[in-house]
Amino acid sequence: MDNRPIGVMDSGLGGLSVVRVIQQKLPNEEVIFVGDQGHFPYGTKDQAEVRQLALSIGAFLLKHDVKMMVVACNTATAAALPALQAALPIPVIGVIEPGARAALAQDKKGPIGVIATTATTTAGAYPATIERLAPGTPVIAKATQPMVEIVEHGQTGTAKAQEVVSEQLMTFKEHPVKTLIMGCTHFPFLAPEISKAVGPTVALVDPAKETVATAKSWLEQHQAMGNHAHPNYHLYSTGNLPDLRAGVNKWLLSGHFDLGTAQIEEGD
């Protein structure tokens, strides 16, 4: 047993999709979450800058005595996962390989679609991972950066959201896929709009689910599961605290939430 919290980070509110799955699948675990809204978006930054920000957040989480770090951000996973794993004395889990594995479990032939930020798409993170896991599987990757802002600004469920999503996903009308990876943790909050745009026969893959399953497996293997009957969720924003509070109220399950601000700078 290990009652220390799980640390979770994202560039903004998207990581709450991972926290929500932790609430569902690991209900006795406490969480410390950092949404780096002060530096949002990561998806338009270069990899070196994202790496430094992620390392700073890792150091912040380590000071709060987390037992594990979940990088609930595809852009940060692509840019910083090996650096975080080398720098921190705790397990660090990203979202890209779990997402790729989940997609391949559903569709071994492809083509597999991927929607992600500009940075994740430019890095080629999903095609490279899928190629490593299942050589020769075709992948159609599309940068859909405007969809990230829709979620971050609380516009899910609106006509504006559907308009933006439908426009961004036109590629998959021309190049149909059976499986679509939501390769940004913001995108599960747009699942209804995405499904409407690509059609009900396309399976949507949320990497959060497989990522949390990976975390749970590690905790079980190392006898490190928590046993909090009523866990606390400590959520920090480096920017807009009211937006974080709105996201918590809209997307997370009920629980005891402590919200606050954190100062994160490159090289902290």
Curated annotation (Swiss-Prot):
Its lineage reads: Bacteria, Bacillati, Bacillota, Bacilli, Lactobacillales
Function noted in UniProt: Provides the (R)-glutamate required for cell wall biosynthesis.
Protein name in UniProt: Glutamate racemase
Enzyme category, top tier: isomerase
Q: Which organism is it from?
A: Limosilactobacillus fermentum (Lactobacillus fermentum)
Keyword entries, A-Z: Cell shape, Cell wall biogenesis/degradation, Isomerase, Peptidoglycan synthesis
Give the pathway: Cell wall biogenesis; peptidoglycan biosynthesis
Any one GO BP annotation for this protein: regulation of cell shape
Which EC number(s) does UniProt give? 5.1.1.3
Which reaction is the catalytic activity of this chain? L-glutamate = D-glutamate
The family annotation for this protein states:
Belongs to the aspartate/glutamate racemases family.
Q: Which PROSITE patterns match?
A: ASP_GLU_RACEMASE_1, ASP_GLU_RACEMASE_2
Annotated GO MF terms: glutamate racemase activity
Active site, per annotation: C73 (proton donor/acceptor), C184 (proton donor/acceptor)
One Pfam family, please name it: Asp_Glu_race
Quaternary structure and partners = Monomer.
The protein's superkingdom reads Bacteria
Effect on the protein of changing C73A: Abolishes racemase activity
